[in-house]
Amino acid sequence: MILSLLFSLGGPLGWGLLGAWAQASSTSLSDLQSSRTPGVWKAEAEDTGKDPVGRNWCPYPMSKLVTLLALCKTEKFLIHSQQPCPQGAPDCQKVKVMYRMAHKPVYQVKQKVLTSLAWRCCPGYTGPNCEHHDSMAIPEPADPGDSHQEPQDGPVSFKPGHLAAVINEVEVQQEQQEHLLGDLQNDVHRVADSLPGLWKALPGNLTAAVMEANQTGHEFPDRSLEQVLLPHVDTFLQVHFSPIWRSFNQSLHSLTQAIRNLSLDVEANRQAISRVQDSAVARADFQELGAKFEAKVQENTQRVGQLRQDVEDRLHAQHFTLHRSISELQADVDTKLKRLHKAQEAPGTNGSLVLATPGAGARPEPDSLQARLGQLQRNLSELHMTTARREEELQYTLEDMRATLTRHVDEIKELYSESDETFDQISKVERQVEELQVNHTALRELRVILMEKSLIMEENKEEVERQLLELNLTLQHLQGGHADLIKYVKDCNCQKLYLDLDVIREGQRDATRALEETQVSLDERRQLDGSSLQALQNAVDAVSLAVDAHKAEGERARAATSRLRSQVQALDDEVGALKAAAAEARHEVRQLHSAFAALLEDALRHEAVLAALFGEEVLEEMSEQTPGPLPLSYEQIRVALQDAASGLQEQALGWDELAARVTALEQASEPPRPAEHLEPSHDAGREEAATTALAGLARELQSLSNDVKNVGRCCEAEAGAGAASLNASLHGLHNALFATQRSLEQHQRLFHSLFGNFQGLMEANVSLDLGKLQTMLSRKGKKQQKDLEAPRKRDKKEAEPLVDIRVTGPVPGALGAALWEAGSPVAFYASFSEGTAALQTVKFNTTYINIGSSYFPEHGYFRAPERGVYLFAVSVEFGPGPGTGQLVFGGHHRTPVCTTGQGSGSTATVFAMAELQKGERVWFELTQGSITKRSLSGTAFGGFLMFKT
């Protein structure tokens, strides 16, 4: 817009003024034509040295309005298609009808102005190559569409995320541009209003001069008035107006250069803005702002175009008026000269009078000529004064125009700097939008990652909860085993080992006493008879042999103990392997159970889908059809069952062998009988020996006594430790064998109960009911779990007969078993082991049974899913002092639970039966005292639906 405005004001205005002066005279403005080189475009100035004629070409902007079709939006519509009937069935009922969504484009008629640059002859030049100079030629008017600005295809669009500050700056810049445009229009109007006075004054002066010259025309018969006046006018114009127009042309040239540079920069900015617009997505508010801005720009463009058209019309009218005045003046002068010549040359009747008085007419000729020359001089002086006055006025006008042009140059520079700032701001906004897009993409990826992490955390949370539940069950089993072990240790009788050790010590003391008596008797016999020495020597040898025999027997006992220990370790390993095998078997059973449950759910879901697709009638027809054969033949099933039975028999034989080995080990683990005490013989003969032999014998006896004591201590320690570990291992092995044998018996009974009548099943040739099989296996597994937990719970809690609704004492875990046996659709059982003293609702957080998902452990209440009669039981272990609580039914009925124990605490249990509506809640509140914190807490809450109402 700025480029078109400045170009439309600068180019045609300068060329129009120069053309008007050039048409006034063909010879007087030659220096002006030579001085117009600085106002030509750069390309024209470069070709001046090569082709002198090329400088006569000038560029003219040409505009062309074109109409085009542009895609504005798309519309959706449905396409209906129908499958034709097959051949031979014209009235088929099952016709396949399809609908498909399609899109069609919607076009809009738009108009667009295409601007191009056309080269034409400069004002004052004609010809095919613009080589002829014609001062009378009327300059070709510029195309009326020059002031049109190429309309945008749409409103100005910015990238999303444009800041409000940038919008305010754009509005401020728009207001500044409108203000500058208004000033420029006022200046142009003022200049246009002052120019007609100058043009009107000049023809008036010329007309006055010509009229006075016509009065003296008959004085110069050989010279026309035009030849007399034109040199003077030419000289006057060259002297007074050439410097002014030269400086004016230089100013216009500099202004044109500045406008060209500014137009190039504005075009570059426009292209950059266009690229930003092409890569941006318009928003509603920015579209509205762009539409307003474009409307104002179009309005200003139209005003500038109208102003330019008015200026051109005025210049053209002035030029036409001047040309017509000069033509009329020339015609009038020619007419008068012709009349004068005719008057001088016409013959008359008074020719003699004229000839008679030539001297008398010739005498006043110098005086009249002198008077006429004086009059002409005065007229020229007045014309000079008038011209000087007009020149001063024109000088003032030109100074005003120069100041206006200077101000316009400053404003253009300011606009140029503002356009640079605007471009920088647009670039900054573009970078910010790109950063925002990158941040938005990163934020979206981070959101996706966080969602994935949250899902993973939920899965990990469920896995940890499941593992905690398994660890809790394992801990309960370990605590039960520990209690059983402590009970066994208390019942263990270790007095037999101590008696054996006392017997060994008595034997050692007897041996020592016998040695002392032998030494005394030897002393006595030595004095009495020397022959008794040989008998004593024999007795010592016998004692040595007995001691060696004791040592050998101790070594054999230690070897037997180590061998027994290794056998017990091997048995322990075998028991561990059997336990692992049993765990794997239980794991496989669980997997089969889950597979059966998944298959059952899939079958129910498929049945629902088939019912929705084909209808209940089609499903009933399909169910009434004869069932197809099984994928496996009954012979294969029979062979598989026989293999399973043989495997169970082999496993039973293996368990019998293992029991026999354990029995043998128990018999072998009994402590050996103590060796009989050997008395030395006193019947041997006596022999004499030296004193040195007796001293050596005494030392050997002392060392033998020490060795016997050491062996006794070692045997005592090893026998005690080995017996304790052996008893513990044997007890654990007995328990493991008993549990495994019972599990095998239960599996065998279950197997025979399920597949005992497989011959009848083969003869019936019907499919197995997987749902019934799954239900049977579930019930057997639950009974097995109840049987496994019964011994441990029997050791801890004992059931008491309920005389009243309110009783005291622990409650066994028979409630869950009763629920499993009854097959109630709604049942729950939960416990609370953390302990609390807050007077609020107790949240039983450990849930063992929750059939129907009606109990919410996070809130601690049960919500009835159906209307019916429910049975509830709550057992609370209160802390020291009195404790009180209440079982709340729907907020309107309360059943108290209290205890008055003053000791270390007591347990209170309450049973209640109530009819609940659907959605009513039941919970337990602590109103006084505290609840004891225990790992195996007796604080529990349970209930189930007895029947619906």
From Swiss-Prot:
The keyword NADP does not apply. GO terms for biological process: angiogenesis; cell adhesion; cell migration involved in sprouting angiogenesis; negative regulation of blood vessel endothelial cell proliferation involved in sprouting angiogenesis; negative regulation of cell migration; negative regulation of cell migration involved in sprouting angiogenesis; negative regulation of cell population proliferation; negative regulation of vascular endothelial growth factor receptor signaling pathway. Residues 133-157, 779-801 are annotated as: Disordered. It holds the Pfam family EMI. Residues 54-132 form the EMI domain. GO terms for molecular function: receptor ligand activity. Residues 167-187, 292-487, 547-596, 688-711 form a coiled coil. InterPro entries: C1q_dom (IPR001073), Collagen/C1q_domain (IPR050392), EMI_domain (IPR011489), Tumour_necrosis_fac-like_dom (IPR008983). Residues 784-800 have a biased composition (Basic and acidic residues). This is Multimerin-2. It comes from Homo sapiens (Human). The lineage of its organism: Eukaryota, Metazoa, Chordata, Craniata, Vertebrata. The gene is MMRN2.
